[in-house]
A protein has these predicted regions:
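Intrinsic, short, N-terminal disordered tails of RNA polymerase sigma-factor systems
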Residues: 1-29, 119-131, 135, 145-157, ...
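Sigma70-family region 2
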Residues: 32-33, 72-87, 107
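Structural recognition of an alpha-helix C-terminal capping motif at a helix-to-coil junction
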Residues: 52, 66-73, 86-98
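Short, Lys/Arg-enriched C-terminal cap helix and immediately downstream tail that follows
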Residues: 54, 105-108, 154, 159, ...
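Short, basic/polar amphipathic helix motif occurring as a linker/hinge flanking DNA-binding modules
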Residues: 104-127, 138
């Protein structure tokens, strides 16, 4: 009877957990206390976002996948280093960004990659579907593809901040902490990036 009661309590707990939408900060704290499912949820939330972010540095999907995997390994093994004084998103993006920068330093004496060399398929995962989604016009679909292409050819410093702001929807303050530059610099880089994107779109039209 006691065992049946324990099982019932566990099922109720699991059902309740599924109904609750935990914040990232609540999930990492739950993970710190041993909740493995909280780790899985964080991975699910951030896998694609980090792929887009890291690819903005390395322009190589295979390498980006490796770096994102390394980011989650660090999340798993260094979970206790997270302190609730910072947002989880800032913390995880900083880890991923540092790993990407380390990879770039390793490439210093290797031939540099360019968007042309990699080909458009390297970034296909960030682009809209091959066919317009329901309710989306062909014109809107093509416009979105042009926006992504314009972002891809921006200088790295501009590309990263505009990805974080306009694609990942992070705040200016979060971006400043992640890329480790003053808030004013972040804003000016984003403004310049948006201007270049606008110019590219005008040429497209």
């Amino acid at each position: 009877m006691e065992q049946g009661s324990q099982i019932s309590s566990s099922i109720q707990s699991l059902t309740k957990d599924k109904e609750i939408r935990y914040t990232d900060e609540e999930l990492i704290i739950r993970f710190q206390y041993g909740d493995e499912q909280a780790f899985v949820e964080l991975v699910n939330r951030y896998r694609n976002r980090l792929m887009t972010f890291v690819c903005g540095y390395v322009f190589d999907i295979d390498k980006a996948e490796d770096l994102v995997q390394d980011t989650f390994v660090k999340l798993y093994t260094k979970k206790d280093s997270y302190k609730p004084i910072a947002k989880f998103s800032t913390w995880i993006y900083t880890i991923a960004g540092n790993l990407a920068k380390t990879e770039l330093r390793k490439r210093k004496r290797r031939p540099e990659y360019t968007f042309t060399q990699l080909g458009s398929n390297e970034w296909e995962f960030t682009l809209p579907a091959a066919e317009p989604e329901t309710g989306e016009t062909v014109e809107d679909h093509l416009l979105m593809k042009q926006i992504y292409k314009a972002i891809q050819v921006l200088p790295e410093q501009s590309r990263i901040v505009v990805i974080l702001r306009d694609m990942q929807e992070l705040t200016y303050k979060e971006i400043s902490m992640i890329v480790d530059v003053p808030l004013g610099t972040v804003k000016s880089r984003i403004n310049r990036a948006r201007l270049k994107i606008q110019q590219a779109l005008e040429e497209f039209r």
